[in-house]
């Protein structure tokens, strides 16, 4: 069982694990009053397993295969409920950028064009250095614009909540939404890198 999640399926067992389990059950039946010395017991099981033929092991191999099927099926059922990364509603208002992100949006393409093949991390580092070298007056236009976008975002969120969630468009719109989501995720990856640079 996984810690903190009692609903997570029990892990799949190997053929050897089934063999050890069987040995333990046999020991309990033959010696119900004798406690198991796990170190000694494990050693005996290991030695016995090594001397067994493939035919003798086949029963445990089959048990392991059946358990893998059980595990895969349960994990498939468990997966969607687990949640993972929550799917975004494409109609939900996108969080507004900070002044630093607006600055990054303006200068990121310039850095990429002058440094072909530069990594996201290095772009973020350069942008962070450039931002930190700006005076408060130079930063002000970006900060002011960010504040206005935040006001608009808060209004849009209120409107969005009052109207309820989207009704789920079908067909080509879904494909377009997927492309937008992928582009947004790529942008967010760059923004996360840049956010780290801003905090340094």
Curated annotation (Swiss-Prot):
One Pfam family of this chain: HMG_box_2
**Record's PROSITE patterns?**
HMG_BOX_1 (PS00353), HMG_BOX_2 (PS50118)
Q: Which keywords does the record carry? A: Acetylation, Chromosome, Cytoplasm, Disulfide bond, DNA-binding, Immunity, Innate immunity, Nucleus, Oxidation, Phosphoprotein, Repeat, Transcription, Transcription regulation
List modified residues, type N6-acetyllysine.
3, 30, 43, 112, 139
Question: What is the predominant subcellular site recorded for this chain?
Answer: nucleus
Cellular component GO terms, alphabetical: chromosome; cytoplasm; nucleus
Tell me the compartments it is located in. Answer: Nucleus; Chromosome; Cytoplasm
Q: Which residues carry this modification: Phosphoserine?
A: 98
Record GO biological process: DNA geometric change; innate immune response; negative regulation of B cell differentiation; negative regulation of myeloid cell differentiation
Q: Give me the positions annotated for DNA binding.
A: 9-79, 93-161
Post-translational modification here is noted as: Reduction/oxidation of cysteine residues Cys-23, Cys-45 and Cys-104 and a possible intramolecular disulfide bond involving Cys-23 and Cys-45 give rise to different redox forms with specific functional activities in various cellular compartments: 1- fully reduced HMGB3 (HMGB3C23hC45hC104h), 2- disulfide HMGB3 (HMGB3C23-C45C104h) and 3- sulfonyl HMGB3 (HMGB3C23soC45soC104so).
What this protein is reported to do is described as:
Multifunctional protein with various roles in different cellular compartments. May act in a redox sensitive manner. Associates with chromatin and binds DNA with a preference for non-canonical DNA structures such as single-stranded DNA. Can bend DNA and enhance DNA flexibility by looping thus providing a mechanism to promote activities on various gene promoters. Proposed to be involved in the innate immune response to nucleic acids by acting as a cytoplasmic promiscuous immunogenic DNA/RNA sensor. Negatively regulates B-cell and myeloid cell differentiation.
Would you tell me the protein name for this molecule? High mobility group protein B3
Species assigned in the record: Mus musculus (Mouse)
The record's gene field reads Hmgb3
């Amino acid at each position: 069982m996984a810690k903190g999640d009692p609903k997570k399926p029990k892990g799949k067992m190997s053929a050897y694990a089934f063999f050890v389990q069987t040995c333990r059950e046999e020991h309990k039946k033959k010696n119900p009053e004798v406690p198991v010395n796990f170190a000694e017991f494990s050693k005996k099981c290991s030695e016995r397993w090594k001397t067994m033929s493939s035919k003798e092991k086949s029963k445990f191999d089959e048990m392991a295969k059946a358990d893998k099927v059980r595990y895969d099926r349960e994990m498939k059922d468990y997966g969607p409920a687990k949640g993972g990364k929550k799917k975004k509603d494409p109609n939900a208002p996108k969080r507004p950028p900070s002044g630093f992100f607006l600055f990054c949006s303006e200068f990121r393409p310039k850095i990429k064009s002058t440094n072909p093949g530069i990594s996201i991390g290095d772009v973020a580092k350069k942008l962070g250095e450039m931002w930190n070298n700006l005076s408060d007056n130079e930063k002000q236009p970006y900060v002011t614009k960010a504040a206005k976008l935040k006001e608009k975002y808060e209004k849009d969120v209120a409107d969005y909540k009052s109207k309820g969630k989207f009704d789920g468009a079908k067909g080509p719109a879904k494909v377009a939404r997927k492309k937008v989501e992928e582009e947004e995720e790529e942008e967010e990856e760059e923004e996360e890198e840049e956010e780290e640079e801003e905090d340094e």
